[in-house]
From Swiss-Prot:
Residues 553-614 form a coiled coil. The keyword Cell membrane does not apply. Keywords: Coiled coil, Leucine-rich repeat, Repeat. Residues 215-244 form the IQ domain. It comes from Homo sapiens. This is Leucine-rich repeat and IQ domain-containing protein 3. Residues 132-179 form the LRRCT domain. It comes from the Eukaryota. InterPro entries: Leu-rich_rpt, LRR-IQ_domain_protein, LRR_dom_sf. LRR repeats lie at residues 51-72, 73-94, 98-119. The keyword Repeat applies.
Amino acid sequence: MFHGTVTEELTSHEEWSHYNENIREGQKDFVFVKFNGLHLKSMENLQSCISLRVCIFSNNFITDIHPLQSCIKLIKLDLHGNQIKSLPNTKFWNGLKNLKLLYLHDNGFAKLKNICVLSACPTLIALTMFDCPVSLKKGYRHVLVNSIWPLKALDHHVISDEEIIQNWHLPERFKACNHRLFFNFCPALRKGTTYEEEINNIKHITSKINAILAHNSPVLIVQRWIRGFLVRKNLSPVFFHKKKQQEKIIRGYEAKWIYITKGYEDKLLKDLFFKPETNIKGKLAYWKHNIYYPVDLKNSSEHRKHVSSILCELKPKDLGMKSKTSRHLIQKGQESEDEIVDEKLDTSFRISVFKLPIYTSGSLKNNAVLREKKQHFFPAYPQPIYTTHPKPIIKKDIRLERSMKEFFAPQRAGMKLRTFSDIDKYYTEQKKQEYHKEKVRVVAMAQVARERVRVAVNEHLNQKKYATQKLIEENKETIQNSLRQVWQNRFNYLEKARERKALFLKEKSQKASERLLVQNLNNERTLLTRGLLKIDRLEKNEAVLKEKSLIVKQKLKAEKYRKNLLKEMKKVRSQEIYKRHCEEKFVMDMIAFEKACERLQDAKTKVAIVKTNLDFKVPNGLIK
């Protein structure tokens, strides 16, 4: 509708005012939310998601789950790997009536009392609490299993009957936490999962838990056996009763009618009752899954009533004078021309028996018309071909004829009764003619009634056609008016859109010119500023250079002064060292002279002593 960049003027338009409200309204339709490992701390945004069914908030920093109170349609809730330390009260869990799977493992729960509030959850099937501090407490599993009644699985194991029923010691197969009861219903999360996949996963987990319980729960196994026994016990009289009733019906109709079975149920019953050696369970299972009704039963019964109303008038009033010759056999594949009004089909076991109508010569002439009517009211549908057992052709009982001939024989008591026989034949023929006339009259009445019905049907069809055409014309006119209104609204909308677009483009061009002027001024100001900055930079550089040169000169002067000072200090130091050296040399010489004097004196003393010693010790004879 708008072209160009979205600006503040567009976002403040009245058509954009409900944008945020629409977003909030759209959150009500969310059914699947998955925020895994996003370091979230709050769930406040889920308060408006009232249609949420699957919620995955694992591996975050969630501490409060009260915002989920409005999500009453939750089926699966995954909160593992968070920092939850306490659960809401029973009112919160009582509102989650559809919650089946709850994942709370790897959290900070520490008290069993706080966990017991989950007993208010009415449909909770599977729960995980492992890797929590509370799972290390003694009796943790016993308390949870006996507090949450609908619970079927807890922490990778399905709940056994030994954990529920007190003081019941079972074999190893049915004990708690057996390997047969192991089921990991919290697999690792996969990326890109959809809502349908999550729902299918929930169904798979539920069915798997039920299957494990069905095969490893003694209570359920015994219940299944008892139900099977009761069902077989209740159904056995039905089978025996139906078999006896079938035999009675067969014996009763062996001398009267040949019945035709229609429908898949009758074929099944015929196989069950006539062939006892067949597989009854297989037949029942096949009938259960493959039963087929090609036409609506109620509609078929209503259609048959129209035909039966015409055929009922073809029957003679005196039922006692029905001719046995009108009863004929129906071969395989042949269908009766008209049928008696059908009763509503019952889904229970029964044998369908249809009586054959009686026809006269007049009624058989209109066979094609009746067949067309039958095809109109009973459309042809593909039906399975049923096997009919051939029946022996019933022969006419001629005992009465034989007795009449014997009575009218001339040998009877020597009396000729030929005249009476002729009179009796005359009256018989007269009755037959009257009976035939009555039948012709009934057929004529039926034809008149059929013609009347045909005219009424045609009138009804014409009225329906006229009403339909009138309704179609009215609908066309309404559609045309609606289309004109739609086109007019669209034209008005386009005009308003064009006006708004022109106004928007005008404002846009004006703002573009203003923006260009501002840009030119900014460019000139920028150039001036750059020149001033360049001059300031040059002046600063010159000042810096002068300062640096001055510093260098001062450093050179200081260096020269330092060198001269070092030279003078070296000279003074050398003089002092020389003077000290001379003094030390004089002192050393004096010390050496004193030592030499002392040595000389010692030597003189020793010499004197030696001399004195020699004077006393030398014998006189040795002295010259």
